[in-house]
Amino acid sequence: MATPSMLPQWSYMHIAGQDASEYLSPGLVQFAQATESYFNIGNKFRNPTVAPTHDVTTERSQRLQLRFVPVDREDTQYSYKTRFQLAVGDNRVLDMASTYFDIRGTLDRGASFKPYSGTAYNSFAPKSAPNNTQFRQANNGHPAQTIAQASYVATIGGANNDLQMGVDERQLPVYANTTYQPEPQLGIEGWTAGSMAVIDQAGGRVLRNPTQTPCYGSYAKPTNEHGGITKANTQVEKKYYRTGDNGNPETVFYTEEADVLTPDTHLVHAVPAADRAKVEGLSQHAAPNRPNFIGFRDCFVGLMYYNSGGNLGVLAGQSSQLNAVVDLQDRNTELSYQMLLANTTDRSRYFSMWNQAMDSYDPEVRVIDNVGVEDEMPNYCFPLSGVQIGNRSHEVQRNQQQWQNVANSDNNYIGKGNLPAMEINLAANLWRSFLYSNVALYLPDNLKFTPHNIQLPPNTNTYEYMNGRIPVSGLIDTYVNIGTRWSPDVMDNVNPFNHHRNSGLRYRSQLLGNGRFCDFHIQVPQKFFAIRNLLLLPGTYTYEWSFRKDVNMILQSTLGNDLRVDGATVNITSVNLYASFFPMSHNTASTLEAMLRNDTNDQSFNDYLSAANMLYPIPPNATQLPIPSRNWAAFRGWSLTRLKQRETPALGSPFDPYFTYSGTIPYLDGTFYLSHTFRKVAIQFDSSVTWPGNDRLLTPNEFEIKISVDGEGYNVAQSNMTKDWFLVQMLANYNIGYQGYHLPPDYKDRTFSFLHNFIPMCRQVPNPATEGYFGLGIVNHRTTPAYWFRFCRAPREGHPYPQLALPPHWDPRHALRDPERKFLCDRTLWRIPFSSNFMSMGSLTDLGQNLLYANAAHALDMTFEMDPINEPTLLYVLFEVFDVARVHQPHRGVIEVVYLRTPFSAGNATT
């Protein structure tokens, strides 16, 4: 476009094209101007031209992306380091926000990878049904016995007494090819054979393997082009059987040895190894292996080194060699990036670029809404014939005073009475199956047992061990907490994101395909706040970064098993850098460069969290944790939550040998789930500072988070959270005080916010002091005896009898009276703002701090009281400060960065 020369050159910095007035009709422009006061069109009709249309002298300036090939690479056992030479030519500006690492490699997700529920092989077979098979007798000298179904009805004949498969074009009989015929999937399609029509002869195939395998989940690979499975160098033998003592054989079976595998099932009821080839081995019970999706973490958390000692990246100008990336152990790069994304976009939408699919869980699994089942109508199943095949009857007719048989009419099958049927409660079965698969299987390991005659590895972090353990029946069942909305207490402290219903992980796993071995081609963004959005001015720079190869850190699995032990490996073959120059004209770029070279126009970047984090160890079963006294100068407040030690890696090393876990890492990805375990926090300063919280409801230096016994009515929302704590969270997150019914706007109530995740719960429980109350053990619970199984995957046991469970709700003698309340608040960091008035953070001075707390250093003590957890945990505290990087590029090839982290005056939070 022709631009009037009077416009300043920097107007081209707006890269979205022409203004509407420059290409729309004069009449439309005049109308827009005349109605602008009450109908503002603004720039709705701006021309979407992106690149400049004049003063562009080279094709390179117009190019969208450039690929930089590394000048040096270092591939070690635990990391892959690359170095790039960034050459930014004159009159150009490199947009660091557009850069990403393009990484190719190969991935072995290990033997524990199973991207589906159930089994892929014979999934409709009963779980304890055997294949057609032979089994040994107690006396090994006696011939093997057979249990089989001869489904292929045909005549036995020919020179070799084979099963006739049909006739050829000359109407001559064709007999079975023993390598694959008769095929096990073939039989009679109608229902009359065997019931109304007599089957004279039939045949099938039988396994003669030395051990028995249930049909459910059994698989054998083909050994010939017809689908036969006979093992190489073995022969098919024919076995003939008849029901009487005389006559021709009625059935023939082609016995073979085959390599039968169970790739996605395991035994949950097994007999001793010595009996598995005998009749006892026929009733072994199979169950599917648990699903285990494996993929890269959300937004590639853990792949690039941050907060990692000497392994941080480098961005340095060749003229000065000053590194713009400063090594700070307690920067929150990954978590800060996760929360920044969640507050700027809808994280419920998945996007394959950058691997964006946030970890989630099914709320119906975390908090069970047990309203029973709608099973008013019975569910029947009927025989295929639709009638009862009764005894064979003769047709008769009246002949004077007697009844006589009708000639040639003796094949009548008459059933008497109602049609026989079987009943199954589908609704109850589906509900209990849901509870078992989604809740019971994820119970803590101390509430599970190893089935008899099953050997599991001693390493409890392996997939084989986790897969082989079964939960005790009765802990999670259809009658537990019936009529209420309640999370099972034993599951509250179990990571709900390590679940096969984590749709984000499932999506990221499926992006890589459904195979254990795969090639990957990924695009990884830079997250470090100081250089993530930098405008890089002309010069030559060294850009270096390291990428982890530890599978537990960069991959995520459903069960959180140790992927190193279970065989997962990653191999990086190439890393390239893609970057874009701003599509500006040379004159515009040079003007922008001159502006940014001036030290008054330095680029400043704030870390999104702007906090110094601390991890304080909490011993198992501890309920009190005092934080050592430390000095402070000024800060905005605290954010805090609780982490499990086994789920928190040591970020300072490329390979943490003690990190034997691959589930979500709350420390990095924000999947917090232990916030509900805090009871109270007390904060004390030295005597020279007055605590700025006298307008709160409770004592000035103590925040009571939840109260179990609430005699004075301090709790809120039918939960055990105090009104005091609820008010503090509303003020800290939304600046909303106690003003009646008032909810935060949508843009404030995103993924990690307080109200978005606050789940209050209430139920009534029996009073143990009531007469007739017995604290029955789990093994004494009668859960529909005879019609279900005692240990959910084992064979059914028992006989019909009344059930033992909670007393009826309507029984006045044993009514559920004692209230029990609690809450969950996953993903949320508790926040305590530091201000004299929680409804206002105060006015900032030109120094960027509130004068109220810009004091000299003072001692600070904090004491936490929390629920006991029987494993080591960590208190995660974010001291909210002002975390700023100021970037100065005074000359060509020179980049200088000053990191300003106020207010701490001592310790590793000081830059």
From Swiss-Prot:
It comes from the Viruses. GO terms for biological process: microtubule-dependent intracellular transport of viral material towards nucleus; symbiont entry into host cell. Keywords: Acetylation, Capsid protein, Cytoplasmic inwards viral transport, Host nucleus, Host-virus interaction, Late protein, Microtubular inwards viral transport, Phosphoprotein, T=25 icosahedral capsid protein, Virion, Virus entry into host cell. SUPFAM superfamilies: Group II dsDNA viruses VP (SSF49749). Pfam families: Adeno_hexon, Adeno_hexon_C. The record marks G737 as: Involved in interaction with pre-protein VI. It is found in: Virion; Host nucleus. GO terms for molecular function: structural molecule activity. Induction: Expressed in the late phase of the viral replicative cycle. InterPro entries: Adenovirus_Pll_hexon_C (IPR016108), Adenovirus_Pll_hexon_N (IPR016107), Adenovirus_Pll_hexon_sub2 (IPR044942), Adenovirus_Pll_hexon_sub3 (IPR016110), ADV_hexon (IPR037542), VP_dsDNA_II (IPR016112). Its main location: virion. The modification Phosphotyrosine is found at Y899. GO terms for cellular component: host cell; host cell nucleus; T=25 icosahedral viral capsid. The modification N-acetylalanine is found at A2. Major capsid protein that self-associates to form 240 hexon trimers, each in the shape of a hexagon, building most of the pseudo T=25 capsid. Assembled into trimeric units with the help of the chaperone shutoff protein. Transported by pre-protein VI to the nucleus where it associates with other structural proteins to form an empty capsid. Might be involved, through its interaction with host dyneins, in the intracellular microtubule-dependent transport of incoming viral capsid to the nucleus. All late proteins expressed from the major late promoter are produced by alternative splicing and alternative polyadenylation of the same gene giving rise to non-overlapping ORFs. A leader sequence is present in the N-terminus of all these mRNAs and is recognized by the viral shutoff protein to provide expression although conventional translation via ribosome scanning from the cap has been shut off in the host cell. Belongs to the adenoviridae hexon protein family. Homotrimer. Interacts with the capsid vertex protein; this interaction binds the peripentonal hexons to the neighboring penton base. Interacts with the hexon-linking protein; this interaction tethers the hexons surrounding the penton to those situated in the central plate of the facet. Interacts with the hexon-interlacing protein; this interaction lashes the hexons together. Interacts with host dyneins DYNC1LI1 and DYNC1I2; this interaction might be involved in intracellular microtubule-dependent transport of incoming viral capsid. This is Hexon protein.
